[in-house]
A protein has these predicted regions:
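Regulatory nucleotide-sensing modules
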Residues: 1-33
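Cyclic nucleotide-binding regulatory module and flanking cytosolic helices
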Residues: 1-8, 57, 88-90, 114
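Short beta-strand segments
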Residues: 2-4, 41-44
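Cyclic-nucleotide recognition modules
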Residues: 11, 43-97
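Solvent-exposed strand-loop boundary residues in beta-sheet-rich modules
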Residues: 36-38
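A small-molecule sensor/coupling module
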Residues: 83-117
């Protein structure tokens, strides 16, 4: 795990990036921007003590959205390797459940990422 500081306007990651880390927001506010969003307003907000960037890590897929700092932010990053170690130490049922929930969430968001309503 590593503590990282970002300035307002910086991206933690962009849509299409590899998903080597997931993040815990310690301080600030993160905006999640879907690829079709050309506005300055995020599709979703991440607040303090919330995790983000988990879907790509859980599913071993590319980032489906970008995470931009709406304010100066401090995050803690957890590498995919560290995440998998923690997950492998837990109940196998939990591992399957997390993966299933992530896939279902991505499917629910898919129309939004393709520009459909």
């Amino acid at each position: 795990m590593e503590k990282l500081d970002f300035k307002q306007g910086q991206y933690v990651f962009r849509a299409g990036d590899g998903a080597g880390y997931l993040f815990l927001l310690i301080k600030g506010e993160i905006g999640i921007f879907l690829p079709t969003n050309e506005t300055k307003e995020p599709n979703f907000h991440v607040g303090e003590n919330e995790i983000f960037g988990e879907m790509g890590v859980i599913e071993d897929s590319l980032r489906s959205a970008g995470a931009r700092c709406m304010t100066d932010c401090t995050v803690i990053s957890l590498s995919k390797k560290e995440y998998e170690k923690k997950l492998n130490e837990s109940d196998p049922f939990i591992k399957g459940l997390l993966r299933l929930l992530s896939i279902r969430l991505r499917e629910m968001l898919k129309p939004k990422t393709l520009g459909s309503k």
